[in-house]
Swiss-Prot record:
Compositional bias per record (Low complexity), positions renumbered to this chain: 813-828
Assigned keywords, A-Z: Carbohydrate metabolism, Chitin degradation, Glycosidase, Hydrolase, Polysaccharide degradation, Secreted, Signal
Subcellular localization: Secreted
Organism, scientific name: Streptomyces avermitilis (strain ATCC 31267 / DSM 46492 / JCM 5070 / NBRC 14893 / NCIMB 12804 / NRRL 8165 / MA-4680)
InterPro entries: Beta-gal/glucu_dom_sf (IPR036156), Beta-mannosidase-like_N2 (IPR054593), EBDG/EBM (IPR043534), Galactose-bd-like_sf (IPR008979), Glyco_hydro_2_Ig-like (IPR006102), Glycoside_hydrolase_SF (IPR017853), Ig-like_fold (IPR013783), Ig_GlcNase (IPR041351)
Residue positions of the active site: 476, 545
Domain of life per record: Bacteria
A Pfam match: Glyco_hydro_2_N2
Enzyme class, first EC level, given as a word: hydrolase
GO cellular component terms, semicolon-separated: extracellular region
Protein name (record): Exo-beta-D-glucosaminidase
pH dependence, entry free text: Optimum pH is 5.3.
Subunit structure, interactors included: Monomer.
Length: 904
């Protein structure tokens, strides 16, 4: 048994999140590395209630360190030749930042990194200085992967058996060990194996990092305070629904006496203009929960509260809780916590599907599965850019299957009104007890306290974020009775406020019951008409993860991630193993996808032709997925209640499961989703040929006109019909405008459908162009597998290949704002003299060298224009991302020559 120093106390508290490195540099240069000096010591504040994050570490493999732990963890130890690491860093992230290895996102470079280097423990060593030792000092940390022995100033204060699990949070009282001046903390990090440890893995998302993310990926905090510590502060909100006229707040915190004597502390705080205080008598080393309610503090009963809403439904106001504990009128500790007031319900509907409502208003969950950086490097700007993309796409939700991000992520989600669905991951240790022959070791007695501490930690960290609307305690499988009780006990103790979901699949647990979700795929290619069937992955119920699989990025991105030889194989050999798709044998090739691409559009004639066909295919498929779920959201029978696109993004340079690529470039998948989810939208239904108007705005709309025109691929008009006086309610309601006939005389096998929606003033408010076939895709439902449904015959879209080339003119100008952002306005016009439209006209903002400027947000893109028609598009971006270059605009299209025009 390990004996700690008598005065070193360990408190297991709550979890911070997956912190990541502060740079996304991948270390593009290989070769000899010049060792840098260790990070400068962190200066720790002496202020009561302060928290100071360690600024970084010197790290080294234990295979190269022969000195004893007492020496390594003592001030003054010469860590010469060690590698510098950021405050949140895996081992490999630090080595990549130092240039030890070539860019792992390019080609197969990652295969060249030796895995054996990470199968031994690594030292993480950091120095900090303390000017005043009279205050109490604690180490507060989470995010250790997979486990660690912890030392301070030469003394071991925790063993890896105690500090285990990526999500557990630990608070160690080191008051007796710190000294004035230099101090040292050292972690001996154990290797990670997600099948054996309750940490995180990458499943079939991408090629797993050679170090399996071993390291410290959250901040290690040095906390200072007086004899009484405040912990676990939070606010329980009760909003009156549906009136939203009042809300009751309950403030709770634990006051802990860390001294050897009895103390009377004063706990005081405020929420807005309401203040409260109470004297609390504490025996030596006693902890009490202090609670303030409207019964004793009338100001905690709010009238006309500022209510938090998801984006598009209202604003995102936040409140602040400030607390302090004082002893003899001297501040001992302080707490600041933000929270929002909102109500979340998610009952099962009559079909057994989970139906979310926020503040009494039902909504269709439309989201994507989130991936962090493969090496868990944190960059707040990069994360914010992606969340802004989610809003641009009309999404309202992000699902986090494991890899639960740091506090800053949820702060951003709160601010932007993006709902989040965090939960545990599948296919490894987390589900080892319940997934039969699947991956992951079964749990031992030692795993249950780690799981409970993980749940308690995440619950305490996430509960006050209004963006968090559930926690999924299972993914592909629901927990068994013992594991579920472990989780639910922790959630109850944390006053968890939102629905707990047993699994992301159609599973049940003994207490939580049915999940109300489905995980029926698909994960690989299926045709657009698949989504309209109310079966399997089609638009009924809540599909927690689904897409048509591969999402080939733009040609610009492909050339950044693959060698010329690999790109040659990409379009020539559908059966070739694709390193940048998935390590899974099921998803290792593009065989299913490529067969469909050739069968529907014609065999590719080269890389450029392959990529342009891929963008068309991805646009129509992603659009259909979201349109089908959008149309089905208010169906009386078997309505659609939620859809999570699998995935929103990838953690590396990928060929599948992404609406946007690693570099934030946007292609067919992105703009297909953006089109489908626009606020007021006209769409075509692949199942019954109906033309439907979907209103995602809160308010009803009337006086609309929907017009549908069908064209042969040469531009010859074959059908035209309008429906006037249309009205549609808000909050996702839809109205059928008209239904197209089953056949139209003279219509070519491949044809185009142009849908235009105008308001009562005749202004165009939605435009949607489809490329369709009189020979639809035919699905073989009887042979459906878990990841796709085979297609026995493909829609014939080969006629697009014979479309005449048409000229498109483009003009552009740029205005720089005072906020560091610029806006470029582009007008594109089909100047052809015939009847042929310019199909799928894409506009990219580039610099003087032709490199895409990213990230960007376009008002619209990949537009189709008939002769004489024009479209004015705007794109906003950070001026600094031009890097001093003059902006230019590159215009290309399905049947339009590429050109680049100035945009200064």
């Amino acid at each position: 048994m390990f004996h700690r120093p008598a005065s070193v106390r360990r408190f297991v508290t709550t979890a911070v999140a997956l912190g990541l490195l502060s740079t996304l540099s991948t270390g593009a240069r290989a070769g000899a590395r010049t060792h840098e000096p260790p990070p400068r010591p962190t200066t720790v504040s002496s202020t009561a209630g302060s928290t100071t994050a360690l600024t970084g570490y010197a790290i080294q493999s234990t295979a190269k360190v022969t000195d004893p732990a007492a020496a390594v963890s003592s001030p003054g130890y010469p860590a010469s030749g060690w590698y510098p690491a950021g405050a949140r860093s895996t081992v490999l992230a630090a080595l990549l930042a130092g240039g030890k290895y070539a860019d792992p996102f390019y080609s197969t470079n990652q295969q060249k990194i030796p895995k054996a280097d990470f199968q031994v423990p690594w030292w993480y060593r950091s120095d900090f200085t303390v000017a005043d030792t009279s205050a109490r000092t604690y180490l507060d940390f989470s995010g250790v992967i997979s486990a660690a022995d912890v030392f301070v100033n030469g003394r071991q204060i925790a063993r890896s058996a105690d500090v285990a699990g990526a999500y557990t949070r630990h608070e160690l009282d080191v008051t007796s060990l710190v000294r004035e001046g230099a101090n040292t903390v050292a972690f001996r990090i154990q290797p990670n194996n997600p099948n054996k440890n309750l940490t995180m893995g990458w499943i079939d998302w991408l090629e797993p990092p050679p170090d399996q993310n071993m390291g410290i990926v959250r901040d290690v905090l040095v906390r200072r305070g007086g004899p009484v510590a405040l912990r676990d502060a939070h606010v329980i909100t009760r909003l009156d629904v549906p009136s939203l006229a009042t809300a009751d707040l309950t403030v709770k915190a634990r006051a802990r006496n860390d001294s050897d004597a009895a103390i009377t502390a004063t706990v005081s705080g405020s929420v807005g203009a309401t203040s409260f205080r109470r004297s609390v008598a504490l025996a030596a080393h006693e902890t009490k929960t202090v609670t303030f309610t409207p019964a004793d503090t009338p100001g905690l009963h709010l009238t006309s509260p500022r209510v938090w809403w998801p984006a598009g439904m209202g604003g995102q106001p936040l409140y602040a809780l400030d607390l302090s504990a004082s002893v003899s009128e001297t501040v001992s500790d302080t707490v600041h916590e933000s929270f929002g007031i909102r109500d979340v319900k998610a009952p099962l509907n009559s079909d057994g599907a989970r139906q979310y409502s926020v503040n009494g208003r039902r909504l269709l969950i439309k989201g994507g599965g989130w991936s962090p950086d493969e090496f868990l490097r944190w960059d707040s700007t990069y994360v914010e850019d992606r969340l802004r993309y989610a809003l641009d796409l009309g999404l309202n939700t992000i699902r986090l299957e494991g890899h639960i991000e740091p506090d800053e992520f949820f702060d951003l989600a709160d601010r932007y009104g993006i709902l989040t669905l965090p939960g545990w991951e599948c296919c490894n240790k987390w589900e080892g007890n319940v997934n039969g022959s699947g991956s992951g070791d079964e749990w031992t007695a030692a795993d249950y306290p780690v799981a409970k501490a993980s749940m308690a930690a995440e619950a305490a960290r996430l509960r006050d974020h209004p963006s968090v609307v559930s926690f999924l305690i299972g993914s592909d499988f629901a927990p068994d009775a013992k594991i579920e009780k472990t989780y639910l006990d922790a959630l109850k103790a944390a006053d968890w406020p939102t629905p707990v979901v047993a699994a992301a699949s159609d599973k049940s647990s003994p207490v939580s019951g049915s999940s109300g979700m489905k995980m029926t795929g698909p994960y690989d290619w299926i045709p657009p008409n698949y989504w309209y069937a109310k079966r399997e992955g089609g638009a009924t119920g809540f599909n927690s993860e689904t897409s048509a699989g591969p999402d080939i990025p733009t040609l610009d991105t492909l050339r950044r991630m693959m060698t010329p030889a690999e790109l040659d194989t990409l379009w020539k050999n559908p059966g070739a193993k694709q390193y940048h798709r998935s390590p899974s044998s099921v998803f290792g090739t593009l065989k299913i996808y490529d067969a469909a691409l050739a069968g529907r559009y014609g065999a590719p004639t080269g890389l450029t032709d392959y990529v342009r066909k891929a963008q068309l295919a991805q646009y129509e498929n992603v659009r259909a997925q979201f349109e089908a779920y959008g149309r089905g959201a208010t169906d009386a029978s078997k309505p659609a209640t939620g859809v999570i696109y699998w995935m929103f993004n990838s953690g590396w340079t990928s060929l599948h499961w992404q609406l946007l690529d690693r570099y934030l470039d946007q292609g067919g998948a992105y703009f297909g989703a953006k089109k489908a989810n626009e606020p007021l939208h006209v769409q075509y239904s692949y199942d019954d040929r109906s033309v439907v108007v979907v209103n995602n705005r809160p308010a009803a709309v009337s006086g609309l006109t929907a017009r549908v025109t069908l064209f042969n691929t040469d531009g010859t008009q074959k059908y035209d019909k309008s429906a006037t006086g249309l009205s549609v309610a808000g909050d996702g309601a839809h109205s059928t405008a008209l239904t197209l006939p089953s056949s139209v005389s003279g219509l070519s096998t491949t044809y185009l459908a142009r849908l235009v929606l105008t308001d009562s003033a005749g202004k165009e408010v939605s435009r949607n162009v489809y490329w369709l076939s009189t020979r639809p895709d035919t699905l073989d439902w009887a042979h459906t597998d878990w990841y796709y449904t085979p297609t026995t015959s493909y829609a014939d879209l080969k006629g697009l290949g014979s479309m005449a080339r048409v000229p498109v003119s483009a003009t552009a100008s740029t205005t720089a704002g005072t906020d560091g952002a610029s806006t470029t306005t582009v007008t594109v016009r089909n100047t052809g003299s015939g009847r042929t439209p310019s199909l799928f006209t894409d506009v990219h903002l580039v610099d003087s060298k032709g490199k895409p400027v990213l990230p960007v947000q376009w008002s619209d893109n990949e537009v189709s224009l008939w002769p004489g028609e024009s479209a004015t598009l705007t794109v906003t971006y950070r001026t600094a991302d031009l890097h001093g270059s003059a902006p230019r605009v590159r215009v290309s299209g399905w049947n339009t020559a590429e050109q680049t025009v100035p945009a200064a």
